Amino acid sequence: MWKGKKPQLTLGERPKEKEWNKMSRIGNKPITVPAGVEVTLDGQKLTVKGPKGTLEREIHKNISVSMENNTIKVTRPDNLALNRSLHGLTRTLINNMITGVEKEYTRELQINGVGYRVAKQGNNLNLTLGYSHPVIFEAPAGISFDVPNPNTIIVKGIDKELVGQTAANIRTKRPPEVYRGKGIKYAEEVIRRKEGKTGK
């Protein structure tokens, strides 16, 4: 016999269903190729060239990509959940490629803490983060760094995923503390500090 409050049944889309429908709607949006950007398709291999560089990506076999009059359309064969998800994802990735080769992506990090700082060392970063030795962070292929001041790092590149992952990897070298806020954080990140324990 069931004891306690009975679970409430609700009508409507399941969480997964809502996500699939969202990705499907994204996939249906055509992509306009801006002037100065060239897109070519060889089988399922998509190449995007622009002022900032070139990116290539293999398109999933279930997804079709066509181009006419500087407009790219992404289509799926049916409404299966996998294909609806791939539909939106593929459209997003292609759009990111076009934006990257045209304008480049950036992610800014800030360093907080007495004595904490960063300096360029060739193409790499030399980080002083309170350890007994400096931390050298090597730039992955396709990534460059700007250091406008000793407490700011700007990660730059045409691959949005790589820019984001590189910034995340730098942050792990000294994540911000919750008590003093010392460490490396994203420029837009808000650190919710905890109050330290006080003696009685």
Q: What label would you give each PLM region?
A:
Residues 3-22:
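Short, Lys/Arg-enriched N-terminal segments with co-localized hydrophobic residues
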Residues 19-168, 172-200:
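N-terminal intrinsically disordered, cationic/polar leader segments
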